[in-house]
Amino acid sequence: MNITVTINGETYERDVDPRRLLIHFIRDDLDLTGSHVGCDTGNCGACTVLFNGDAIKSCMLLAVQADGATIETVESLSANGELDALQQAFSDHHALQCGYCTPGMLMSAKHLLDQNATPTEGEIRKAIQGNICRCTGYVNIVEAIKAASK
């Protein structure tokens, strides 16, 4: 099936297998490997992207369902190789260890901050509740998102 999708401001037209998941289309067909595949079942959130402005788990959507959509992946955050404020806050607050969950956490946090520039700690925790981190215990992640909101 032929689809046209805009990812990180660039429009792609591709023929895709109707059974192909969006995450595999993004990573394997377009070579945008910043989003991670953790579970392929929608549980971990490592594959979170912004889909028409909403945070979604890209392992839960078929690529053909993205026809006509606008998608932002973690690659959209940095410009000219420089970290954006959210990425810098994650670095400054040691909000990552292994880094596997980080792309999904960043995109969930971006979605929150796009909707609410000054979220409470409770709102931050709710926004990232679909993202699993087995390393940090979430404290530094929450602190990083708070710092990025200032």
Summary of predicted features, one role per range:
Residues 1-150:
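Signature of N-terminal electron-transfer/Fe-S-associated modules in redox systems
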